[in-house]
C-alpha cells in the first residue's frame, strides 16, 4: 500500500515532465552526455537509462559512449544540449570544463554552446538507478525549460 502510493507520486512527477515536453520520437533533438572535457578531447556516456530519460524531454543522446573524442567530433555531433557529468575522478578538469567549452572558438557554432545550453550534473545524480533518476529528470527538465 505504501509502495503503491510512492509509485503513484513518482509517476505524477514523470507525467508533469512529459506534459512540458511534448514531442514525437521523429523529432527528437540532439543531446550529448559528456565527461572529462579538457579543451582538446572528451568522453561520453551512453546507456539505455539516460536515453530513456532524454526521450521524455524530447532529446536523444548522440554520444558514442567512448572517450578521447576530439573537438571536431563535438562540432559534427551538433548537440542542442550538453549535459556535462562531473565526478571525483575528474574533479580538477571538471572545474573549468564548461567555461573552456564556452570560450573555445572552434565550438562557437555548436548549438548547445551558442545558445548556452550546457548544464552540469554529478555522476551520482545522473547515473544511479532508482528514484534519483526522477530527480535528475526534473533537474534536466528545469534547465531545458528555463
Predicted region positions:
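Basic- and aromatic-lined ligand-binding clefts that recognize polyanionic substrates
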Residues: 2-57
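Interaction modules related to DNA damage response and DNA replication/repair
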Residues: 55-69
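Structural recognition of the beta-strand scaffold that forms the well-ordered cores
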Residues: 30-35, 62-63, 82-85, 118-121
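Proline-aspartate-enriched helix->loop->beta-strand connector
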Residues: 71-84
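Alpha-helical scaffolding within the catalytic cores
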Residues: 19, 68-73, 101-107
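Extracellular/periplasmic catalytic domains that process cell-envelope and extracellular macromolecules
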Residues: 23-27, 75-77, 111-114
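Structured C-terminal subdomain patch of bacterial secreted/periplasmic proteins
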Residues: 85-146
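Soluble non-cytosolic domains of exported or imported proteins
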Residues: 4, 8, 44-48, 68-69, ...
